[in-house]
Amino acid sequence: MTTQRKPYVRTMTPTWWQKLGFYRFYMLREGTSVPAVWFSIVLIYGVFALKGGVDSWAGFVGFLQNPLVLLINFVALLAALLHTKTWFDLAPKAANIVVNSEKMGPGPIVKTLWAVTVVASVVILAVALV
């Protein structure tokens, strides 16, 4: 015997995520993937320009000096920093580190991750500029 009752289907508007700050921030964080794709494409373009020789590399550097490209790269940098911050804030929740029978707080883990990021960035810049 089947029932004639219709199931309740809750309506969902396309802007449902705009009502709560948590969801807006989630969508912003997920949106950081778009600038990451831009950065990846520019990086691949740079590798092929480097392989192509001096003229190709000069064209790539000229492309990077375009004000619109500089603006997009700045937005990509901000997006990468936001994404990094959210992942570093998430890392202590996944790690259960116990020191002297007490669970370590998130502060030292996050600070260590940022310190490693800064040191790695400085080393990469030093190698690139020498």
UniProtKB/Swiss-Prot annotation:
Major localization listed first in the record, in broad terms: membrane
Molecular functions (GO terms): succinate dehydrogenase activity
Topology in membrane: Multi-pass membrane protein
GO CC, one annotated term: fumarate reductase complex
InterPro entries (alphabetical): Fumarate_red_C, SQR/QFR_C/D
Localization: Cell inner membrane
Name of a matching Pfam family: Fumarate_red_C
Gene3D superfamilies named in the record: Fumarate reductase/succinate dehydrogenase, transmembrane subunit
Record field: transmembrane: 34-54, 60-80, 109-129
Claim: Membrane is one of the keywords in the record: yes
Keyword line: Cell inner membrane, Cell membrane, Membrane, Transmembrane, Transmembrane helix
HAMAP family the record matches: Fumarate_red_C
Its biological purpose: Two distinct, membrane-bound, FAD-containing enzymes are responsible for the catalysis of fumarate and succinate interconversion; fumarate reductase is used in anaerobic growth, and succinate dehydrogenase is used in aerobic growth. Anchors the catalytic components of the fumarate reductase complex to the cell inner membrane, binds quinones.
Quaternary structure (record): Part of an enzyme complex containing four subunits: a flavoprotein (FrdA), an iron-sulfur protein (FrdB), and two hydrophobic anchor proteins (FrdC and FrdD).
Family the UniProt entry places it in: Belongs to the FrdC family.
Protein name, as recorded: Fumarate reductase subunit C
Phylogenetic placement of the source organism: Bacteria, Pseudomonadati, Pseudomonadota, Gammaproteobacteria, Enterobacterales
